Regions:
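Short, compositionally biased pre-sequence/patch detector
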Residues: 1-183
């Protein structure tokens, strides 16, 4: 899973790498560093992504295997990754505008406050743990909605007022009630 926040450095929540070689030949720390350096050299920000926007991508696929000692990504790899990101951005589902299909490959929020409002709404409805795009955010959060809201709102305190303003009054009251019970 890949998260891009406006112009900030992308965050990769989960990365799978297939290594072709023997276990004895594999140096896991060196492989990790090489993959990190290779991916860090690619600008994954899709053109037109507004500053502050949050794009969460379910999967990003590379091309054919790279040579084990690659020091730079070949230009066709870079072009392929950028084209995927462009498509994922332009076809992203918008949770703030309505339900997201279970097979959605990416979701887009206009900013962190919109993302927090949608996450709050899904926690209140008991749906957050079922949504693939919340998994990296909820990884270290308590399962109960009240303590989860307390942890999430505390970590994103500057976004809470705008997030609450976009909720329905009954949703905001319910969220405050759960939040208060968890303190």
């Amino acid at each position: 899973m890949l998260t891009i926040r406006g112009q900030a450095q992308p965050t990769i929540g989960h990365l799978s790498v297939r290594y072709r070689g023997t276990a004895a030949e594999m140096n896991a720390p060196a492989l990790r560093l090489r993959v990190q350096r290779l991916l860090g050299s690619v600008d994954l920000h899709p053109a037109g992504l507004p500053t502050g926007a949050v794009l969460i991508v379910r999967r990003l696929h590379g091309l054919a295997p790279l040579p084990a000692q690659s020091q730079i990504l070949p230009s066709d790899w870079t072009a392929h990754l950028r084209a995927q990101m462009r498509t994922l951005y332009t076809t992203a589902a918008r949770p703030a505008l309505g339900p997201v299909a279970t097979n959605a490959t990416s979701v887009l929020f206009t900013d962190g406050a919109e993302m927090l409002a949608c996450l709050t709404r899904d926690l209140l409805a008991g749906l957050a743990w079922q949504r693939w795009y919340w998994q990296h955010i909820l990884r270290d959060v308590p399962k109960a909605p009240g303590p989860a809201l307390a942890a999430l709102w505390s970590a994103r305190a500057t976004q809470v007022p705008a997030a609450l303003a976009s909720l329905e009054k009954t949703e905001a009251r319910h969220a405050f009630a759960l939040f208060s019970l968890s303190l």
